[in-house]
Amino acid sequence: YNGDYEVPIRLYFPSEEAMSGEPVDGEKYPVLLFFHGGGWVTESVENYDRVCSRMAQSTGHIVMSVEYRLAPEYHFPVPLEDCYAAAKALYTGRLILPADPDRITIIGDSAGGNLAAAVCLLARERGEFMPRKQILIYPALNNCYTEESPYRSVQENGEGYLLTAVKMEDYLRLYESSPDDRQNPYFAPILEKDLSHMPDTLILTAEFDPLRDEGETYGKRLEEA
């Protein structure tokens, strides 16, 4: 629950044994906690159904996909708090799953990568649980995609590809509650000055993507911290 709102989730199991809730040989299952992409505005658990099913089958993990609320009906921080609430329920054992709490990985793509990174920052701040691993797939981590962006990938790849710099600015405007949100590290995780005590992290970027350089920069800063 996020307040009075029950956050919907969808579960994917790698086997019938996992679905039955019985640990195999006494061992519980690793879990991928997945936040989908879509600019905080589009997409859904249903749109990522096949992706999550394949992840469960190919990795042997239980996959938990979160149906967080979307902008513009729900602005920052509502989608983030929905994701945090789902993560807290999983990490604190409130969900009846044969899940190993020491083998939970938070994963998300694009806006979902933003939410995954922000959930880890928020978890460190609140101290209610702490993820051990995160996978950020071409994450959206910055707060500016105009000509003022310091990242070369925004200038080089901001036009002519599926995701444009103009689209990213549109998504940010729809997600923010006010322009002040753009200075909040939970809105744009790359703004966080202290990246110590964060989970082990894998970041995947795409060469011809405006998000490329911010993902690589975030990875280097995590490594240095």
Predicted regions and their residues:
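Alpha/beta-hydrolase superfamily serine-hydrolase fold, recognizing
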Residues: 4-225
